[in-house]
Amino acid sequence: MATVDRWLLPDGIEEVLPPEAARIETARRRVLDLFQRWGYELVITPHVEFLESLLSGSGQDLDLKTFKVIDPLSGRQMGLRADITPQVARVDAHTLRREGPSRLCYAGSVLHAKPRALATSRSPIQLGAELYGDSSTSSDIEVISLMLEMLELAMVPDVHMDLGHVGIYRGLARAAGLSGEAEQRLFDAMQRKAMDEIAELTATVEPSLAAMLQALARLCGGRETLDAARRVLAEAPAPVTEALEALIRIADQLALRYPDLPLYFDLGELRGYHYHTGVVFAVFVPGVGQSIAQGGRYDDIGADFGRARPATGFSTDLKTLVSLGKAELDSRLSGIWAPYGDDTALWQQISRLRREGERVVQALDGQNGETAATAGCDRQLILQDETWTVAPLAS
């Protein structure tokens, strides 16, 4: 590599400089404090793990996103984490092994071999919360509410939420007796809302079930969508109607708690179908082509670690949250400029001010170029009546 190119970073990999780094760190602390007030405990997971652990229960998409390396000590394949969620599931299932609900949260950098979308970062800062050990809709409502509180704290404007439930499609597909290949082809057609293809793929299915499957792709819109789904799926198998009623309970509670939040329902949108097992949700804002926060239920994710547990949670990219949010994250520097010197009294005053929480920058011996202004200081230490005193900078 030529010397002139040594500063280049790979596509989608960026560094965060001051003052933006200070804004992101302020936001991280505020959000983690919010999670703590809701009872969520912070966990810190490693950047690299053995691949089979890192990809447990996650499906092919995460495999394609994961950078892979060989551990020189064991010879086993390892992965650089592309998603923290499976790691937290391992912590809950294998390390903590708690009985009853467990609330965990996290914040850390992840690395993607492929970007989520064109011109997006491959090194987001993933932040999220997970609730393990409860299969009721109350836990889904809690994590969705926490996600919305996080967005409100960040002052992200004009949010709207998409809600769905993969159990509705899964229940119909199983009742129809579709093979794995046929179910996958139908799933692909559902995502494209290819009505002719959906009709062709369900031509050999029992007519009432075929009609329900074909209707799913058209069941999208506002709250009226759920009323229409109740009519269309009235004779559906029990797992389907139970999934629909769970979705309705969640939607009703969210409407009560957040009456101004626009809710959109698409029963044919199967985001995370191979990973999630119940409700799925995502938050969007105008002008951004992908969700800014997303999550859902993924029961039994801990099975690969020897302890299956119901689970629900959400995640977001902290850098995206900060860039979209309007919250005041003051990154302007202030501080006290201290002159260079070996005076013990000066050192004691500097130490005292730092212990009190002040930012103090001391000049270096013979330095050139740095001044109180370039160091971000708005005050200075001056010797006055043989005492080191904080004073405004001379104008």
UniProtKB/Swiss-Prot annotation:
Keywords: Amino-acid biosynthesis, Cytoplasm, Histidine biosynthesis. The keyword Nucleotide-binding does not apply. One of its GO terms (cellular component) is cytoplasm. It is found in: Cytoplasm. Coiled coil: none annotated. One of its GO terms (biological process) is L-histidine biosynthetic process. Pathway: Amino-acid biosynthesis; L-histidine biosynthesis; L-histidine from 5-phospho-alpha-D-ribose 1-diphosphate: step 1/9. Transmembrane segments: none annotated. Pfam families: tRNA-synt_His. NCBIfam families: hisZ_biosyn_reg, PRK12292.1-1, PRK12292.1-4, PRK12421.1. HAMAP family: HisZ. Belongs to the class-II aminoacyl-tRNA synthetase family. HisZ subfamily. Required for the first step of histidine biosynthesis. May allow the feedback regulation of ATP phosphoribosyltransferase activity by histidine. PANTHER family: HISTIDINE--TRNA LIGASE (PTHR11476:SF7), HISTIDYL-TRNA SYNTHETASE (PTHR11476). This function is generally fulfilled by the C-terminal part of HisG, which is missing in some bacteria such as this one. Heteromultimer composed of HisG and HisZ subunits. This is ATP phosphoribosyltransferase regulatory subunit. The lineage of its organism: Bacteria, Pseudomonadati, Pseudomonadota, Gammaproteobacteria, Pseudomonadales. The gene is hisZ.
